[in-house]
């Protein structure tokens, strides 16, 4: 896999990078490519945000954490100072990197590194910067130059170095390297112990913390929402208070106006009552004469209405006599209609027998229905006294009695024929 790193404004590509490749190995490969020694730091930049990567961090894993924003993240190699063994005169002789795209593979150190289980990763001390002394050297060379720097400088600056001093220096370096190796072994054992102890709970803790972060984000969003709602409600409350104050002022003004109007009404009522009493006294005198005249008129009207009532009674009696005669004629017509209906039934029966040749039993009309029809006629006959309206007959005679010759069933007894 390829990793793009910006070095002095030039984009360089490091090949052979995997998820277990550390930032220290990437820095060493780039330092070899540009041919400069010194102290370097690998920076992860996204927009205006920068983060220094530790030597033991994996740049591929760090980029994968950005998700969809990984393409916007830049890795920058920045030189923060000279190396420990770099002479002061070497600063003036610095190579200028070429402004071209350069590919550099990882040094053999990454290939020869022993295979370790991914679940047990070595945690080195967190440092914000890296020191490179030219080439991919072993751990003994990197960590063995701490305390002998002053002594080595004195030995190198002294032109009269003897063999004993060189042997002494070599012996000191060997002893120091052995002690560092022992310390490294003990540190590695301790690191593996603590990693095995806490690695099982680490993922659960990470998941728990991520869930807690999500819950906190949701709570923060809810708090922001309710804060906005609170501000809106406070503004509404302020507006309502102002409106309430205005309404109270208007109510006070209306009450004052109402009191003034009530006082004016009382004065007007007192004046109206005085005028009313005065008019009543005047009208009482005038009304006596008018009442006498009206009484005379009423008596005359009563006499006239009495005469009219006599004439109406005579007319009512004449109408009743004519109504009785009409009722009698109507009864005669009803009887004639019943007789014709019976004859029509006989004719229909004879036609039915001639057409079908079946025996037919003829049932006579029920007397109850005939009596009910006569009762209806008698019920319609009486005339209400005092009314000039003539009650209409509930039966209507056919205009042409020849219509009865058609074979139809009688309305008095629709079920009178049984076959």
Curated annotation (Swiss-Prot):
Entry-linked PROSITE patterns: RA
Alphabetized UniProt keyword annotations: Chromosomal rearrangement, Phosphoprotein
CDD domains: RA_RASSF8
Residues modified to Phosphothreonine: 131
Domain of life: Eukaryota
Protein's UniProt keywords contain Mitochondrion: no
Modified residues (Phosphoserine): 105, 129, 387
Tissue-by-tissue expression: Widely expressed as a 6.2 kb transcript. A 2.2 kb alternatively spliced transcript is expressed exclusively in testis.
Domain Ras-associating: 1-82
Single GO biological process annotation from the record: signal transduction
Keyword Transferase attributed: no
Gene3D superfamilies per record: Phosphatidylinositol 3-kinase Catalytic Subunit, Chain A, domain 1
Disease field: A chromosomal aberration involving RASSF8 is found in a complex type of synpolydactyly referred to as 3/3-prime/4 synpolydactyly associated with metacarpal and metatarsal synostoses. Reciprocal translocation t(12;22)(p11.2;q13.3) with FBLN1.
Protein name (database record): Ras association domain-containing protein 8
